[in-house]
């Protein structure tokens, strides 16, 4: 899955 926990990925923020 596409996880992203840093502010640059706010549009698809997923932790």
Swiss-Prot record:
CC per GO annotation: extracellular region; host cell postsynaptic membrane
GO terms assigned for molecular function: acetylcholine receptor inhibitor activity; ion channel regulator activity; toxin activity
Modified residues (Cysteine amide): 15
Predominant localisation class: secreted
Keyword field: Acetylcholine receptor inhibiting toxin, Amidation, Disulfide bond, Ion channel impairing toxin, Neurotoxin, Postsynaptic neurotoxin, Secreted, Toxin
Disulphide bonds in the chain: 4-9, 5-15
Subcellular location: Secreted
Tissue: Expressed by the venom duct.
Function: Alpha-conotoxins act on postsynaptic membranes, they bind to the nicotinic acetylcholine receptors (nAChR) and thus inhibit them.
Free-text note regarding domains: The cysteine framework is I (CC-C-C). Alpha3/5 pattern.
Family: Belongs to the conotoxin A superfamily.
Protein name as it appears in the record: Alpha-conotoxin-like MIA
Organism, as annotated: Conus magus (Magical cone)
UniProt lineage: Eukaryota, Metazoa, Spiralia, Lophotrochozoa, Mollusca
């Amino acid at each position: 899955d596409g996880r992203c926990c840093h502010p640059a990925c706010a549009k698809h923020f997923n932790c």
